[in-house]
Design a protein with these regions (language model features):
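Mature N-terminal, pre-catalytic/accessory segment of carbohydrate-active enzymes
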Residues: 1-71
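Carbohydrate-binding surfaces of carbohydrate-active enzymes
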Residues: 57-67, 72-487
Length: 487
């Protein structure tokens, strides 16, 4: 509260470091925001917005009102800056960041780290390898609390009243694995939803621009992520969570500018469909007087959009195709390990690097989180006869992006995969240290495969969806089984 405090203590001989930890309800950014790691705080949102809606319109729930859409929630402990690689600076281990906190989070940290937990907290504000375990433990707890306190609490409330909970978090700028405006772990952040969700806006997709930095009015995008990882994050969560029934919604078309006509919209739709997105929110309609400067293009624009008479054809095409790609099973033979856990602990290759190589070679895949090998209540995993099966999704190969650290359960699963005949690859680096236990990492003599050779190795194992006569880096293909047909 601003009252000066005098601290008296007897310093030992030599150099002494004094660390003072303070909790506060204000960080200077979104101070009105609920606390995503506190169940009571998140319940305030339900009481203030959801309950009054049900009180007034409950008779229409499940009929006229099919659900609630949550748009871009996150920890919001800070805004964060954009780094040179177009990612957010809100990564755990940065020395000047205020961290999400609650009594329950502190209790679980104490439980996991035992009596020395306060002495280990300094690792949360450094990227020193010695702090890998406390960083991972903190983020593991924080993202589990985000899931339980916010997303699942809202989802459970909705389902009890016969409606769905859908929406998406901020995925860009690596927010999906970090704090700040991010939610720390994509799969946990959408775990309470009845559909997975993503959005693509402001020219985050552009034909033939699939790598490097692409400028926009607030900075630059990492185009490799949007082209090769974003949609697959959503469709992977849709497949791995039985509650979602293979459904993933994408906000599309919004804020691209007036240059985006129906031809580009069709290209964006195809980009999403072939990657498993089968529900859409066409985000480009405005009822404001023309011209409305907010997030054009606008489909109708009070008759000023000359392509409006043909817009229905695009919607009809998207509706028919999305229907054909619903209720069935996409054949994706490769699992790529989601890198969030490894990044919290230390150096880690982002998933889009591996995804780009596989996509250009027509090798389909899902992203699979490390918690699949840890959480038996949420994931049913079997490893046998050359297959890794996660909640009925079957994979013939497992690819781990380069990382310095690995979890004990993931390492054990990889050993079992290799013994069962599943193809196992570690890209560029084999981790040598655990982030959640002591001891040496033993992966059965696994050696690193250079990133440039990964697609070739998988293709040699017959894992391409289609096999072109010559390399076709821009060809995309999906094989889908539905109602006794494969197409």
């Amino acid at each position: 509260d601003g009252t000066p405090v005098r601290l008296r203590f007897d310093a030992p001989a030599g150099i002494t470091t004094l660390e003072l930890y303070v909790t506060s309800q204000k960080t200077g950014f979104r101070d009105e925001y609920i606390n995503m790691v506190d169940a009571d705080s998140c319940r305030m949102l339900i009481n203030a917005a959801y309950e009054p809606t049900f009180e007034h319109l409950g008779d229409e729930f499940g009929k006229t009102i099919l659900g609630f859409f949550t748009d871009e929630p996150g920890f919001m402990n800070e805004k964060g800056a954009t780094l040179e690689d177009a990612s957010t600076s809100s990564f755990i281990g940065r020395g000047d960041m205020a961290l999400p906190w609650s009594d329950e989070l502190a209790r679980r940290l104490h439980e996991e780290l035992s009596a020395s937990w306060l002495a280990e907290l300094r690792g949360l504000w450094t990227r020193d390898p010695a702090g890998a375990r406390v960083r991972h433990t903190y983020m593991d707890i924080a993202t589990q609390l985000y899931r339980a306190c916010f997303d699942e609490q809202i989802g459970d409330w909705c389902r009890k009243r016969g409606v769905m909970h859908i929406g998406h978090v901020i995925e860009d700028k690596s927010c999906h694995t970090r704090l700040g405006q991010g939610a720390g772990h994509y799969f946990r952040a959408v775990a309470g939803q009845d559909m997975a969700g993503i959005d693509v806006v402001i020219n985050q997709l552009a034909p033939s621009v699939d790598h490097g930095r692409y400028s926009y009015f607030h900075g630059a995008w990492n185009m490799e992520f949007f082209t090769y990882a974003l949609a697959k994050l959503g469709s992977s969560a849709a497949r791995l969570d039985p509650k979602k029934q293979g459904r993933c919604m994408a906000e599309v078309f919004g804020a691209f500018g007036w240059h985006e006509g129906l031809r580009e919209m069709k290209w964006i739709a195809d980009h999403m469909l072939v990657r498993g997105i089968n529900w859409f929110t066409p985000h480009a309609f405005s009822m404001a007087p023309f011209p409305d400067w907010d997030c054009p293009p606008h489909f109708y624009a009070h008759g000023n959009n000359p392509q409006w008479p043909h817009f229905g054809q695009l919607m009809s095409y998207m509706n028919r195709t999305a229907t054909l790609l619903s209720g069935g099973y996409a054949m994706r033979p490769v699992a790529i390990l989601y890198h969030a856990d490894a990044e919290w602990a230390g150096n880690a290759m982002p998933i889009e690097r591996v995804a780009a190589e596989l996509t250009r070679a027509q090798i389909d895949f899902d992203f699979v989180p490390a918690e699949a090998f840890e959480d038996e209540d949420r994931y049913e995993v079997s490893i046998a006869d050359g297959l890794l099966t996660v909640n009925d999704c079957r994979y013939q190969a497992f690819v781990m992006p380069g990382a310095s650290f690995i979890g004990a359960a993931t390492a054990e699963a990889m050993r079992r995969m290799a013994d069962a005949g599943v193809m196992v690859l570690a890209v560029d680096e084999v981790p040598g240290t655990f982030y959640d236990t002591d001891g040496a990492v033993e992966l059965g003599g696994l050696v690193a495969t250079p990133l440039a050779d990964v697609a070739r190795a998988l293709a040699s194992a017959g894992l391409q969806t289609v096999v072109p006569d010559t390399p076709q880096p821009w060809l995309r293909a999906l094989r889908y089984k539905r109602v006794g047909e494969t197409y």
